[in-house]
Regions:
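Contiguous, structured surface segment used for ligand recognition
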Residues: 1-135
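Aromatic-lined carbohydrate-binding surfaces of glycoside hydrolases
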Residues: 10-13, 32, 42-46, 56-63, ...
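Active-site clefts of carbohydrate-active enzymes
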Residues: 332, 452-484
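Conserved, mostly hydrophobic/aromatic
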Residues: 28, 91, 167, 326, ...
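Extracytoplasmic/secreted proteins, especially bacterial periplasmic and envelope-associated proteins
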Residues: 19, 23, 27, 94, ...
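C-terminal non-catalytic alpha-helical accessory regions
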Residues: 119, 490, 494, 504-510, ...
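Generic structural signal for hydrophobic
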Residues: 167, 253, 314, 456, ...
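Extracellular ligand-binding/catalytic regions of CAZymes and related secreted enzymes
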Residues: 106-111, 509-526, 531-532
Length: 726
């Protein structure tokens, strides 16, 4: 006889509490083929009862066996009788997390694009559990938007909503919207100049046609662009679409109780506003040369008016945000008044004890800045300039007060790639109630600077560390940084920081580190190894655990090596041009990484031969295809370099009048170039054979253009340049 199961909620339960009940109902069907009934009568007879709701609800307090004090994120799972389990939370979101925690204990694992169910969950039962969970990392943020073809550029609104829902199961409680300043997020006008430009993907056209490998995965798309933007041409059209799109994301996130922030790019403007700047940047400060910033007096009236307009447009168009971020452009040029700015800051905030010259010296000499010492000094000085500017700007404009009226908290960030020395004093010079965050291009780069985090007093700042589970500078290569993330979170927790913010691009590779982050956010004793063993055991089977842990170790080493030079396969137009023009084969570091990918592929093949769970084959094939993509991409770069050597030899032979030798080397160059292009085609072909999620679609479209279409053109142009007469 079927067992009767009820899920009891309060008659006045909030929508999210009821959602928690329907989620539990759905999982019970999928796991045990049990069709539970949702009821508001907690005393109704049943073979098994789940009491679901907020702490303080009468039915929870009656059944809970003494529900403990719970924070807004705290949740409790307690079997209080043979036939009764209580799932309670300090907020509606936490009630959902109690349900998801129970479902995980039934054997389900949450991936960022799907759920994985156990092959056999066994008979229905109430789990023997009595646990109260409170967060170790109170703020757990994921960037939802990355204006990049291998990130979410190719995702529909529904794709984003599905991603948010999976993050919620992993107990993420905050989301950040982070479009580039060139995107049509806001509309504004200053002194008769109206914003008229806005572009997605930095206006990089990566066309899609019938020649594209993997065309069958790309629908009717004509370029790598979010489906909702197909056909939009004018700024007003794009702005209306993006605004609707962003509000769709915000509404869905908030329906789950997720806190939403947005980066405002308050000191970076579309180029039509250059005439208003006293000394505008004239060299490109970001991809596409679509934006500019002020190099002169930051407090000149027109610059103040522009910054004000950016703030006010965000408050008017996105007034339902919880946080709004401000700061500097990624590539900052606001250093011109550094000395005067520092003098004002020193007086205003009592910073006379800070050795600014010593910090400048460390900035110049650390060698830890991508872009070199010149960038490091320029951006450190620019950060000092921005602290002074925002202090004066907020005092003059009242923007902070208007943000407070809307319940929006200000957030300021610091790029630790270049300005980490400012952590020695920044906590003393921030606007009141401002949250602070730091970032860098890779987790391993942040770990190199942990000692600087120790210098900052976190009191009142609720600081978070922004890091990556993968970095777009390394392109669409498999990346793992779990051990570095572990070191980082252990340090920030010890120092009293509030949490972390993650950036992602493609999502197919990130489940292992995400599993770690989800567990470590609630368990200070969680380690990468322990989480890996649980994760791989449930996804692939026990025999696969040890070799897959070794795979993660090798990939993490490869990621750390790649984080030093950055940029091998950065998904931007022309990225392969320098490889076409190179006259050297792969360097030792790249060869080392390529060999690591080959070893990982071999290890994955052995895992498959030893046998995995019945539902694991496609995931294992996906990982193998990611290795093959990377191996072929590095092979292409190596062959292009060898082709460049052969072209150089051919040119030298012709210069000395040896046409036979010239033709011999030209033939070698053609062979290398042909093989290089075939390697690029092979890379995209294998990726197209294992498409798992929306970011894969963007990846195969973008890298067909970069590794095949553009390389073909670059080779022809380079050969014609060296041998204009043939």
């Amino acid at each position: 006889m079927d067992r009767s199961v009820t899920i009891c909620v309060d008659s006045e339960a909030a929508a999210l509490e009821r959602f928690a009940a329907t989620q539990l109902q759905s999982y019970l069907v999928k796991l045990f083929d049990v069709r539970a009934r949702i009821t508001t009568a907690s005393t109704e007879k049943a073979d098994a009862r789940f009491i679901v709701g907020l702490k303080g609800r009468p039915h929870v307090e009656r059944s809970g066996g003494g529900v403990p004090n719970l924070s807004d994120q705290g949740h409790m799972l307690r079997r209080v009788a043979d036939d009764t389990m209580v799932l309670a939370g300090g907020s509606p979101s936490a009630v959902c997390w109690a349900v998801y925690e129970l479902v995980e204990r039934y054997g389900v694992r949450y991936l960022v694009h799907d759920d994985v169910y156990p092959e056999n969950a066994g008979p229905f039962h109430l789990a023997e559990v009595d646990v109260v969970l409170e967060p170790v990392q109170r703020t757990r943020v994921m960037a939802l938007i990355r204006d990049n073809p291998i990130g979410s550029q190719f995702w529909s609104l529904d794709d984003h909503k599905a991603f948010i829902s999976q993050l919620f199961k992993l107990k993420f409680n905050a989301a950040r919207l982070g479009y580039a300043a060139s995107c049509p997020v806001i509309s504004y006008e200053v002194k008769g100049i109206r914003r008229v430009t806005g572009n997605m993907n930095y206006a990089q056209d990566m066309p899609i046609d019938d020649d594209n490998i993997g065309r069958e995965h790309l629908g009717l798309a004509r370029s790598v662009v979010t489906p909702e933007f197909e056909g939009a041409e004018t700024f007003d059209e794009m702005h209306a679409i993006l605004k609707h799109f962003l509000h769709g994301l915000i509404d869905h996130a908030k329906s789950l109780g997720i806190y939403v922030s947005m980066s405002a790019h308050t000191m970076e403007f579309p180029t039509e506003f250059r005439p208003l700047l006293q000394d505008p940047t004239t060299t490109s400060i970001q991809l596409g040369d679509l934006t500019c910033s002020e190099q002169g007096d930051l407090m000149n009236p027109d610059h103040v008016a522009l910054v004000s307009a950016v703030f006010e447009a965000h408050l008017a168009e996105y007034g339902d945000l919880d946080e709004l971020g401000f700061g500097l452009p990624e590539f900052a040029y606001a250093q011109s008044d550094f000395r005067d700015c520092w003098k004002r800051l020193r007086r205003r905030f009592g910073l006379g004890d800070v050795d600014i010259e010593g910090l400048l010296s460390v900035t110049r000499e650390s060698g830890l800045t991508a872009g070199g010492a010149q960038r490091a000094e320029r951006e450190f000085k620019s950060f000092v300039g921005s602290l002074d500017f925002y202090d004066r700007f907020f005092a003059q404009t009242g923007v902070l007060e208007r943000m407070a009226d809307k319940g929006i908290r200000p957030t300021m960030g610091l790029n630790m790639n270049s300005s980490h020395q400012a952590l020695a004093f920044v906590h003393r010079a921030l606007p009141e109630n401002t949250r602070f965050q730091v970032c860098d291009y890779a987790a391993s780069r942040l770990v190199c600077k942990l000692r600087w985090l120790e210098k900052m007093d976190p009191t009142g700042l609720d600081p978070i560390v922004m890091t990556t589970v993968q970095d777009d500078n390394m392109g669409w290569l498999p990346q793992v940084s779990t051990e570095n993330l572990h070191i980082l979170l252990q340090a920030t927790h010890r120092l009293g920081w509030d949490g972390f913010s993650l950036q992602h691009w493609a999502i197919g590779d990130i489940d292992p580190p995400m599993a770690y982050l989800a567990r470590a956010s609630w368990d200070a004793g969680a380690t990468p190894g322990a989480v890996y063993r649980d994760h791989f055991g449930h996804l692939y089977g026990e025999r696969a655990v040890e070799p897959l842990c070794q795979v993660m170790r090798v990939l993490e080493d490869a990621t750390t090596i790649l984080s030093i030079p950055l940029g091998y396969f950065f998904p931007v137009l022309g990225v392969m041009s320098r490889h076409v023009r190179a006259e050297t084969p792969l360097n030792d570091a790249a060869l080392h990484v390529g060999a690591m990918y080959e070893e990982v592929r071999r290890m994955l093949e052995e895992v498959g031969e030893d046998g995995v769970l019945s539902h694991a084959g496609s995931r294992l094939a996906y990982w193998s295809s990611r290795m093959t993509f990377s191996i072929e991409a590095f092979h292409e770069v190596d062959l292009l370099g060898r082709g460049g050597i052969a072209l150089g030899e051919a040119a030298s032979a012709r210069a000395r009048g040896d046409e036979d030798d010239c033709q011999k080397h030209l033939s070698q160059a053609r062979d290398y170039h042909d093989r290089a292009i075939r390697a690029g085609e092979a890379a995209v072909t294998v990726a197209a054979s294992n498409v798992q999620d929306p970011s894969d679609r963007g990846g195969i479209a973008a890298y067909y253009h970069l590794l095949v279409r553009e390389v073909n053109r670059f080779v022809r142009e380079y050969v014609a340049e060296i041998f204009p007469s043939g």
